[in-house]
Amino acid sequence: MNNPSLDAYQQIFGMACLVGRSSGYKGTASELQQQLQYDLSFYLNNVPPVTILGQTGPSTADASVTPVLGSWNLVWGPALLQENNDDVSDNAVFVAQCDAVAFPGGPVMPTYVVAIAATNPDSLYDWESEDFSVSQVVNWSTYNPSSFSPSDYNGTDPYISLGTATGISNLLGLTTVETAAAPGTTLEQFLSSVQPTENTAVIFCGHSLAGALSPTLALYLTEQKKMEAFDLTLVYPTAGATPGETNFASLFNSTFPALPSGWEQQSLPYQSWNTMHWNDLDVVPHAWQKQDLQQIANLYGPSPNFWTEASLQALQAYAIVDSTQSGAVYTRIQNSPLSGTLQYSMGTSAINVPPKSIQDFVEQLFIQHVEMYSGIPADGSNPEVTGLILPQPLPPSPSSYNKIVPGISTVTEAEMIAKIISQIIGWISKHALSDMKSGVKEEK
């Protein structure tokens, strides 16, 4: 069998893109889980049928997919969390398996991938309880995902943010539904029970929020000795904020070296394991190191509009306040910056650079955080843009395959942009109101 056109790094990133499709819909938890499972059936083999959409047996990946992505089987999930009955997916994860992955500079190995979903722009829970919950920290040395609370920073032990601790707890608490792959099991139970063939790898991957959760989950399960059935555990996080502080980053780096023993170093910037890859024009991975947060307001140039510039400076200032409040010094795990390029349009709409409005800023942010990693197809007079990891997005499913589970509604890109703007303004306003209340108390 010929190797797919995507290398191993790109295939793994492709899995992170697939699980992220959960953000494109609204519905109940059950409806969203079925929709994600249906979407996966175009790309993966052995996805259990979604009978409500007329499927009658396990899937076979579409013929347009395997020459690009390779032949992967769904073996667990997908599982999905909807925390507040808010009609959106807050966390999602699945596990896929391939009999033979050719690792550049390394061997050909059977491989499992744990793919974790990115931040859902429409999820207030994601923003408040996971992404932005960094002013308090949790001691990693005593962390128990089923029961934890923030603690004072002692400067000696490794610590993770409260948001990261919450996300890991959520992922480990998920149980697959009866119509999913490996029904009625948790992720930890599944990984502990797998009996892989000799010389099998497992890779944890995820983008954005999952760029913080995937290395943290891999480290937790490794320390709990849940990965012993596998000969090699790797991580491929992208666009993630910092999950923890200096001691945590050092612990991760020493546990997961960037180059497995005996493997050859690769030449392209995205080609390294156990390394967080990030676009240097992406706002999200500038969190939560203070020196990087100090760049976000003017990352796309200082706005000529007073109110826009004031809003972005407030966003930056409040982010720094939150990141430094606990006393922990947030620090990236080993990482590789990728060189982004500013974009001047989104579809047929122009984007002002520097941004004249919050809309300009968020549209640029969205492109840099999402589309620049996976490539942008040509659109009218706009030429295609080669992605930083994928040259172009994975093959799209044809309209004949795009069925929708009853009760599900789709979320447009414009709606995502509007929601991000709303979340940012709401977050700034919440901090400003807190400052006003503190000022009133001090006057009294």
Describe each region flagged by the PLM.
Residues L124-E128, S214-L217, N247-A249:
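A short secondary-structure junction signal
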Residues M1-M109, A115-T119:
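N-terminal low-complexity, Ser/Thr- and acidic-residue-enriched intrinsically disordered segments
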Residues M1-A16, R21-S22, G173-C205, L219-K444:
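Serine hydrolase/lipase
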